[in-house]
């Protein structure tokens, strides 16, 4: 990555704010999102810098929360060298040792979409990603860029899960994971296993962090992120291992 600071690398970029809209995580609050100008085509260095500032990727868009009077969304990341799996996580790794993994470009694959659609219909029928569609999937998870990857998890050829991940110069960014919702595979905890796999990927690549997106104390759906210890939190400018005070 460039020796320039993240702020120096991004100061000439254009950003836009969305109008206030209902928060997907805290139903009693409104949210506003800061987006990088969609006309910008950020290279690796700019994306690296924005990730250090708490930005995430969704399809072609780089964004972060920018809500008036609310700082509940906190960017979190795992320091790879200091991470030691818990006993339950070690057992999970052993339980999934029979899975085959393969990394692919973040292109559209019909087999992936079919699994994604099953996952959304089964696990998130009450969310804003329902109903699934080809257009929604392409917009969300495909991107023709060298840093964007899809990791497949297969059992004897059967596709069980896919993790969308980005390769940063200073880490791996876990974008989204979807998996087979069948009860037969529940004990595999494929969502957790996908994160453990990305931690090991970062270790092999010599990348110091795995970025998990945002953590919200009041949101139970995000509580799993604190199962990965230690965890670093972005307090606005600095990454620290103490949870910041938020409103």
Swiss-Prot record:
Recorded superkingdom: Bacteria
This enzyme's EC code(s): 2.3.2.29
Catalysed reaction equations from the record: N-terminal L-glutamyl-[protein] + L-leucyl-tRNA(Leu) = N-terminal L-leucyl-L-glutamyl-[protein] + tRNA(Leu) + H(+); N-terminal L-aspartyl-[protein] + L-leucyl-tRNA(Leu) = N-terminal L-leucyl-L-aspartyl-[protein] + tRNA(Leu) + H(+)
SUPFAM superfamilies for the chain: Acyl-CoA N-acyltransferases (Nat)
Major subcellular site: cytoplasm
GO biological process, any: ubiquitin-dependent protein catabolic process via the N-end rule pathway
Keywords: Acyltransferase, Cytoplasm, Transferase
Enzyme class, broadest EC rank: transferase
GO CC aspect terms: cytoplasm
GO MF annotation terms: arginyl-tRNA--protein transferase activity; leucyl-tRNA--protein transferase activity
NCBIfam families according to UniProt: PRK01305.1-1, PRK01305.1-3, PRK01305.2-3
Membership in a protein family: Belongs to the R-transferase family. Bpt subfamily.
Function noted in UniProt: Functions in the N-end rule pathway of protein degradation where it conjugates Leu from its aminoacyl-tRNA to the N-termini of proteins containing an N-terminal aspartate or glutamate.
The name this protein goes by in its record: Aspartate/glutamate leucyltransferase
The species this protein was found in: Chromohalobacter salexigens (strain ATCC BAA-138 / DSM 3043 / CIP 106854 / NCIMB 13768 / 1H11)
Lineage: Bacteria, Pseudomonadati, Pseudomonadota, Gammaproteobacteria, Oceanospirillales
Gene: bpt
